[in-house]
C-alpha cells in the first residue's frame, strides 16, 4: 500500500491506560461540553447524532465506554456550518470552536469544541501549534454519490488534500507505529521536504482546505447518502437521511444523546457486533500525556 493511502497524520489509537480518577474527571468535563453542545443544537433546531464509541457507549453502557476518553458527534454539512457560525457568538466566552475557518493553524477537516482554560495533549498532536484543550469532536457529513466509483474518487481526492494540509503546517507529523526502519526514515524526510517545498511554492493551508471542500461538497447526483470524508473508512459509516432522521435519544450518563434512527445499519459495517465487549488488547483510547482540568489540577 502506498504511504499516501494510509492514515498518516491522524490520531492513532493507544492501548495506554489512565489513572482511574483522572479518566473519570476527563469524561465528566467532556460530558459538560456535550451538554452545552446539545443545548445549542436544540435551541437552534440543528440535528446532530453521536458516532463511534459515543454511540456504542449509549447503547451498551448508557454512558461512556469504561476506557473511552473522547466524545464524537456528527452533523450534516449545512447544520455543521450553521453551528460553527453561531457557536462562537453564543458560547465564545467558555469555548474555542476550532475549524479550518476559525483557527488558521488547525490541520484537521472536522471541528472541535474546546473548553477554555484546559489542556489535553495527545501524543499524536503534540506538534500542533493550536489550542490543545479538553474537547469533543464534531464531524461534518457531506452528500455523496450513489455511484461507488465516483464516491471512491471523491474519497481519494479529499484524503489527498487533507494530508497535504497537515504538511503545510507540520513538517514532522506522527507516523503510524507499524511504520519502522527505512520506511519511517523515508517518510520523515519526505514530509520535511514537502513542507519546505510547499512554503517555497506558496501552497497554503487555505488552498488545501478549498480543494478539500471542493471535492467534499460537490455531489453530482440527487442522493440522500452522506459520508464523513475526514474519516479514512468513512464508507463504513455512511448514512441515508431517510433512515437516520428524525434521530432518537438514548441515555448517556445523566443526560440523553441523539443516535440515528437505524443505528444498527450505521454502526455494524465499521464495528461488527458492537454490543459485545472487545478483548482487552483492543480497548483503545487517545491517551493524553498531559491534562489540565482547568481548576489547577493536572494528570494523565
Describe each region flagged by the PLM.
Residues 38-71, 75-81, 242, 261, ...:
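Active-site nucleotide-donor binding segment shared across nucleotidyl transfer reactions
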Residues 148-153:
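A short secondary-structure junction signal
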Residues 2-6:
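Conserved oxyanion/phosphate-binding beta-strand-loop segments in alpha/beta enzyme cores
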Residues 155-159:
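Short, His- and charge-rich active-site/binding loops that engage polyanionic ligands
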Residues 10, 14-42, 87-146, 166-300:
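Conserved catalytic core of two-metal-ion nucleotidyltransferases
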Residues 83-85:
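Conserved SAM-binding loop
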Residues 161-163:
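Mobile amphipathic helical/loop "lid" adjacent to a hydrophobic cofactor/ligand pocket
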